[in-house]
From Swiss-Prot:
It comes from Drosophila hydei. Belongs to the glyceraldehyde-3-phosphate dehydrogenase family. The gene is Gapdh1. It catalyses: D-glyceraldehyde 3-phosphate + phosphate + NAD(+) = (2R)-3-phospho-glyceroyl phosphate + NADH + H(+). NAD(+) binds at residues 11-12, 32, 77, 313. The lineage of its organism: Eukaryota, Metazoa, Ecdysozoa, Arthropoda, Hexapoda. Gene3D superfamilies: Dihydrodipicolinate Reductase, domain 2, NAD(P)-binding Rossmann-like Domain. This is Glyceraldehyde-3-phosphate dehydrogenase. The active site is at residue 149.
Amino acid sequence: MSKIGINGFGRIGRLVLRAAVDKGASVVAVNDPFIDVNYMVYLFKFDSTHGRFKGTVSAEGGFLVVNGQKITVFSERDPANINWASAGAEYVVESTGVFTTTEKASTHLKGGAKKVVISAPSADAPMFVCGVNLDAYSPDMKVVSNASCTTNCLAPLAKVINDNFEIVEVLMTTVHATTATQKTVDGPSGKLWRDGRGACQNIIPASTGAAKAVGKVIPALNGKLTGMAFRVPTPNVSVVDLTVRLGKGASYDEIKAKVQEAANGPLKGILGYTDEEVVSTDFLSDTHSSVFEPKAGISLNDKFVKLISWYDNEFGYSNRVIDLIKYMQSKD
């Protein structure tokens, strides 16, 4: 597999490295101007949410060494100054959350990167969701986006429902775990005042572009979806509530059967299915993009249903970043 560089060693950057280790992918370089190599070792080894790293990690001669493999460490603020070529990094994961446009992310190419994958939604880069629209990828694309964790949960389920029952319109709510952008106690937050309220104390209504982004990866649904979020005081794992009006009438059992068929077939490993009496912590470190749970959903009639799907918004997403790179490499 092509060699990977990671820019930004935050929540997603570190978990992309864990996912790469699990999947046998080769990470050869990490850049973060705010964390030295010894602190990288500490942050990678210990994780309050996903637990201690099960392999070995150390700092040796300025390198980050994971399971015996040396990883070059850079500390550049400007992506244009990162010498990815010197470390052999070809595919760069842009996980700072800062350089999310094609223009900004393209600066990695100056340092020798061949392709850039933005681990966030992008205003102008082509967006891809594994299991949904990878066939739209073209080798001439230099910068792409892996969309958001919520879009990765929503899109595979929406694809199955639309392919089989025709979606007329959708309202989505994601009940979303806290993220690093939130405040531990009340503080200022620019234009969106309540986003600055204490994350541990509140259920906070928030905006999300995840539903509209589905229209970019499934063009047939463009303009048919929108949604919002509730940020809740849990550290990880979120859940999508999809309220759908169908074009073709179907019983709830028929919908369940089609989702299970997809989960066991073409979307295996991306879309999961469970009949268990689950709660959010049961999905910690789950590698699926989306796990459909029929017991939590309801049907009003054969054309109006509420569908529920869980996702580890950190680790499931990080696994898809590696899967996207693997797919790109197979086509480049």
